[in-house]
Amino acid sequence: MVRTYLLLLLLCGPATPFFNHLMDVTRRLLDSSNATWQRDQPDTHRLSRLDAHVMSMLGVGSHIDEVSVNHSQHLHNFRSYNCEEGRRTLTMMDPKSGKFKRLKCNENQTLSKDCASCIEKKSSIMKSEHLVYDDAICQSDYSSPEAMPDHETHLCRIGPLHIQHCTHEAKRVQHVSWFWIDGKLRVYDDFSVSWTEGKFLSLFDCLNETSKDHNCNKAVCLEGRCSGDLQFCTEFTCSYAKADCNCKRNQVSGVAVVHTKHGSFMPECMGQSLWSVRKPLSKRSVTVQQPCMDCESDCKVDHILVIVRHFYPDHYQACLGSTCLTGRAKDKEFKIPFKMADRLSDSHFEIRIWDKERSNEYFLESRCESVDACAAITCWFCRANWANIHCFSKEQVLILVAVSSLCILLLASVLRALKVIATFTWKIIKPFWWILSLLCRTCSKRLNKRAERLKESIHSLEEGLNNVDEGPREQNNPARAVARPNVRQKMFNLTRLSPVVVGMLCLACPVESCSDSISVTASSQRCSTSSDGVNSCFVSTSSLLQVSPKGQESCLILKGPTGTAVDSIRIKTTDIKLECVRRDLYWVPRVTHRCIGTRRCHLMGACKGEACSEFKINDYSPEWGHEEELMAQLGWSYCVEQCGGALCQCFNMRPSCFYLRKTFSHLSQDAFNIYECSEWSYRINVLVSTNSTHSNLTLKLGVPDSIPHGLISLSSVSQPPAIAYSECFGEDLHGTKFHTVCNRRTDYTLGRIGEIQCPTKADALAVSKRCISSDSIIFSKVHKDSVDCQSSIIDPMTIRNRNKLPSTVGSVTFWPTETSVEAAIPDLASATMLIRLDGYTIQFRSDSNKCSPRFLSLSGCYNCEAGAKLELEHVTDFGTALGILECPSLGYTTYYEVKNTLEKSIRTMHLNGSHVEAKCYFRCPNSESQLTIRGELIYLFNDDIRHHNQTLSPGLSPKSGSGWDPFGWFKASWLRAIWAILGGTVSLIIGVVIIYMVFTLCLKVKKS
């Protein structure tokens, strides 16, 4: 017995397909042709497979055109074809004409898989030979074509059917729900379907009482010549005597009624088809940068005048020298103020201007010639005008002399008044003082006499008063007493001189300056010389170098084993930005609500028992549309009980079921990325240049970037300022950025961006079920057969157009960048970069050329971002050489590419003193020259030059100290003559006094 069971178990596995096949054949022989056809339709045809008692699309015979030849001419590319195997006919609807076409093969032929031709293969009994492309159902009772409202959809085109004009379209293949009556097709986005019972003959099966045939002419029932059950006699007039037909309620679910915003109707057919559609696409809103052809600019001493003609300017961003300024223009002619230091050298400037709509960006480029350092100070009452004495005009000198004279007179008057007051007071106090002093002297004399008497009495009583050794000690004590005060007096005089000496030493100290260059010497062990005299060295180093302000360079000078400079790596700062470190939150679609509903009378379809209360939020009803696409979208499913009985077109008195699906439809194919700024960090763009390469790099803290045979990174940077903005930013598909108030993740507060949150762009474009929102975003109210839905979903496109960047929020101006957002903050940063070289190759020849440099000028400002400009001219006797200028007292080193033609070069120096006079050395391969650089620099206080609607972008702080050097002008060249006269006069007076004292001393000695 056990063996028998084991044998059956072993046979069950292999025999299962055979039994399944046998059951399928049996079912096909027993079932009706309609049931077999429904079962053999594709699995995606949920609607046509819904109920075996509902009429299929094959029943609309008069509207079907059969095609037996040239099938490929009728297969248009707005469908996706798959005829599988064993299909002899393909029926499909043309959305433009509203007609049905049936591709048909002969009896012994079947359609190919792509449906384009017929192949010699007979159809099988195991699969229905009729295939319908469209998932649809039909009914016998329907309204007239005029009862259908016009199209109400966001689609522009469906295949060849043109619905509405769209300027910008996006093509997509999707399932489209449609409704059809007698060759007329309509498409709606929002609709509901109710299945009603009532005075419809299609809900009853009538039997001819005489012939017992079901082919009874139902038209006679409308004349009252039929009898039937209670439901039939309730709706129609029954004749119980000599009735032609006897009618009973069949199993058809009811008659479908479609409800739209503009009316209701009964369709002849309704379904859903996979078609190629065109959806509206929003206009590309990316900001286009273009030159401002008819704009003018004029460089003034303290501002740039800009004139715009063909558009109305709004936000602008202007950079001159090391300063970048942002603001808003009030008119077509506006001024952009700049720091005085930015006019001390020839500077290229660039202005970016946005129009009022912020959809077009224009740029204007030009150059401002330098002005004299003293001429750059154009203000009268500002601090810079009175801090630089060597820039004083004649009027200022006269004012200074007058003010000094007035101060001296005022001081003399005060001293004279104090003297008069003191003299008058002394005259009053003098008698009292004389009496008091007389009393004090009298008392002191008496006390001294008594003390002497007492002392003499004590000494007389003591023994040993006549000791011989006491005499010498008493004689030496007065000498010591006299000597000690002399030593103290000398020490006191020395301490009085100490502050003066310290002050003189402080004035004698040289000025200090941070270097913007460092040198690296190659090891001789890693150098080699080729046969043609070319030396090759490999350099490996890790060096820290301070980042220069905008428009200036930092240099890494590479030297050979002999200490001769042979190459350099230049790092020029192009700009500095305070950029948002973005943290993506979610994607937001641009949608509106969409509600789909269908009502079933009790005991019809799925409305049975407690089915309505058991209906879940993710359940599906076939009348809603294509399940795969509809249920893949974010939405919520509900079942709402409605009335039953005759008043609600139902035969059953129990409540009917209204199946509701709340979902969304796109306003356009747009999605918006919403992100917040977790922090703000500096981003410094630099140009790294060697003798053979040029690379544009971006320096970020802790993010290295590659250079030839090395890496460069931002080693340290000052703490960025706190940005008083805690809201979000958004970005559309074209890169246009905007600021907005938004919900954070898992917060779905209505009325702000983030009511719907999608994890990816693809999810937002499809409003997939991976998106998250609250079902309260759509308010719905069911009215028996229809549903009224309302929503106030925020349109991100409106927010984008209103808050497009650049924009000023509070006191901060935000500017769009390629990947993030930049904030304009008037702060100076201090940054250091790390340069790592590993096997960097330098090649050079041992030349013997000499250099001839000459100092021309040194002008500009000290302790400022722009720095001072050092101008030299240089030339070699032959060839090209790399010259190094070193100023040890200033801590400054830089390089020059010296050629055999006379050239002028300008370098930037950062100093912290007003008067400069230092010895420098200019070294070439076969020469060393000594230069003396001299100059008078000015100090420009960091005054706020902005208007009320302007903001300074962040910059880099100067490499020297900060502050005003108030005593530096004492060393100015124009004061040297004065100091020489004063010094000569004082020296003459001191010499005369010394000679007189020596002469007097000699006379006293001679007389004694």
From Swiss-Prot:
Q: Which residues are glycosylated?
A: 34, 70, 108, 208, 691, 696, 912, 949
| Pfam families xref list | Phlebo_G2_C, Phlebovirus_G1, Phlebovirus_G2
Q: Where is this region: Fusion loop?
A: 601-607, 644-655
Name the segments for region: Important for correct targeting of the glycoproteins to the Golgi complex but not for heterodimerization. Answer: 461-465
UniProt keyword list: Disulfide bond, Fusion of virus membrane with host endosomal membrane, Fusion of virus membrane with host membrane, Glycoprotein, Host endoplasmic reticulum, Host Golgi apparatus, Host membrane, Host-virus interaction, Lipoprotein, Membrane, Palmitate, Signal, Transmembrane, Transmembrane helix, Viral attachment to host cell, Viral attachment to host entry receptor, Viral penetration into host cytoplasm, Virion, Virus entry into host cell
> Which portions of the sequence form the region Golgi retention signal?
419-465
The leader peptide range reads 1-17
Q: Report the transmembrane regions from the record.
A: 395-415, 978-998
Q: Which InterPro entries match?
A: Phlebo_G2_C (IPR043603), Phlebovirus_G1 (IPR010826), Phlebovirus_G2_fusion (IPR009878)
User: Where are the Lumenal topological domains?
Assistant: 18-394, 514-977
Any one of the GO CC terms: host cell Golgi membrane
| Site positions for Important for glycoprotein C and glycoprotein N subcellular location | 1006
Residue ranges in the Cytoplasmic topological domain are 416-496, 999-1008
Q: Name one GO biological process term.
A: fusion of virus membrane with host endosome membrane
Return the annotated site residues (Cleavage): 513-514
* Outcome recorded upon mutating residue 439 to A: Budding defect; no effect on Golgi subcellular location
Look up the coiled coil feature and give its residue ranges. Answer: none
Keyword Nucleus recorded: no
- Per the similarity annotation, which family is this? Belongs to the phlebovirus envelope glycoprotein family.
What name does this protein carry?
Answer: Envelopment polyprotein
Q: Which gene encodes it?
A: GP
